[in-house]
């Protein structure tokens, strides 16, 4: 656990544990009258990061009382075979949530697969219907990483109202949905989304009261790009070579943590920050899926 010297850290370990404890209590109450929530994960290939992430999700689910199954398919599985599995899971009344682990192999079109998932079982929140609901302000499932960031801010008493929020990265998984959440009347931030074609990126990041780095580039945001006393959220998780470690690499974020930390009011570490909150919010979405399916049955 962080000590007093880590007061600036947004501790994903402690915050995600609090979420898991709440979900566990909710599931214990739910299962008095219902079966446990059931999550089916689909993993294609042997990407080490994807395999580790799925194992982490399985561990989290077991901790809170969610039952899981993982369909691990060969890397050369055809798109049609993958779609057949997704359709089978859609039709299976015992499955509450479906998670297709990304990225998929190059020969599979991710958008086609995501669109094939039953939106009522799309606990990742990536289906166009669920993204549209989010944009309209009536979300069913919020994508887990933006959801986790908002939960982290809330539980850390960081109110984004009137903040200049700058998001570096415009993906459908993080940047765009997070911008939408920060623009809602419950958040009231002023939002700028930057990307690879943004002119003078540092001019934007230097004015950010809330800076979210989701560019997928190791240590991309340095101290010169950060405003004094900013809140810095690092979504990135990148492997960099490090012969001094047993694994030969270490994990770093999109932010130069050691350089930026002295300037930041609050900052997330990598690992131990946003990634843990992402996993925790997936559990909340899965429980919600079980509740929605029970009420619609």
Swiss-Prot record:
GO molecular function, one term: methenyltetrahydrofolate cyclohydrolase activity
GO biological process, alphabetically ordered: L-histidine biosynthetic process; methionine biosynthetic process; purine nucleotide biosynthetic process; tetrahydrofolate interconversion
Catalytic activity line of the entry: (6R)-5,10-methylene-5,6,7,8-tetrahydrofolate + NADP(+) = (6R)-5,10-methenyltetrahydrofolate + NADPH; (6R)-5,10-methenyltetrahydrofolate + H2O = (6R)-10-formyltetrahydrofolate + H(+)
Binding positions for NADP(+) per the UniProt entry: 169-171, 196, 237
Signal peptide, first to last residue: none
Entry EC number(s): 1.5.1.5, 3.5.4.9
Record keywords: Amino-acid biosynthesis, Histidine biosynthesis, Hydrolase, Methionine biosynthesis, Multifunctional enzyme, NADP, One-carbon metabolism, Oxidoreductase, Purine biosynthesis
The name this protein goes by in its record: Bifunctional protein FolD
Subunit and interaction comment: Homodimer.
Alphabetical list of PANTHER family matching this protein: C-1-TETRAHYDROFOLATE SYNTHASE, CYTOPLASMIC, C-1-TETRAHYDROFOLATE SYNTHASE, CYTOPLASMIC-RELATED
Pathway annotation from the record: One-carbon metabolism; tetrahydrofolate interconversion
Known function: Catalyzes the oxidation of 5,10-methylenetetrahydrofolate to 5,10-methenyltetrahydrofolate and then the hydrolysis of 5,10-methenyltetrahydrofolate to 10-formyltetrahydrofolate.
Family: Belongs to the tetrahydrofolate dehydrogenase/cyclohydrolase family.
NCBIfam families xref list: PRK14186.1
A cellular-component GO term for this protein: cytosol
TM ranges: none
């Amino acid at each position: 656990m962080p000590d007093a010297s880590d007061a600036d850290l947004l501790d994903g370990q402690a915050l995600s544990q609090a979420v898991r404890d709440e979900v566990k209590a909710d599931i214990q109450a739910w299962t008095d009258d219902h079966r446990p929530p059931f999550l089916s994960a689909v993993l294609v290939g042997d990407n080490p990061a994807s395999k580790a992430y799925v194992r982490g999700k399985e561990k989290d689910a077991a901790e809170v009382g969610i039952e899981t199954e993982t369909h691990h398919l060969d890397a050369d599985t055809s798109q049609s075979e993958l779609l057949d599995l997704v359709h089978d899971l859609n039709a299976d009344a015992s499955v509450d949530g479906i998670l297709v682990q990304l990225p998929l192999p190059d020969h599979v079109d991710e958008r086609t697969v995501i669109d094939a998932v039953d939106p009522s079982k799309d606990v990742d929140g990536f289906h166009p219907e669920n993204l549209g609901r989010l944009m309209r302000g009536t979300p069913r499932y919020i994508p887990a990483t933006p959801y986790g960031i908002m939960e982290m801010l809330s539980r850390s008493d960081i109110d984004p109202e009137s903040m200049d929020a700058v998001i570096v990265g415009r993906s459908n998984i993080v940047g765009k949905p997070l911008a939408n959440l920060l623009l809602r009347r419950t958040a009231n931030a002023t939002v700028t989304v930057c990307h690879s074609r943004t002119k003078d990126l540092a001019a934007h990041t230097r004015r950010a009261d809330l800076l979210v780095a989701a560019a997928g580039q190791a240590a991309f945001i340095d101290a010169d790009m950060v405003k004094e006393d900013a809140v810095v959220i690092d979504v990135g998780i990148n492997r960099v070579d490090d012969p001094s470690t047993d694994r030969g690499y270490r994990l770093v974020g999109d932010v130069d943590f050691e350089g930026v930390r002295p300037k930041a009011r609050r900052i997330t570490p990598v690992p131990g920050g946003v990634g843990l909150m992402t996993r925790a919010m997936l559990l909340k979405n899965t429980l919600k899926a079980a509740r929605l399916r029970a009420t619609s049955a």
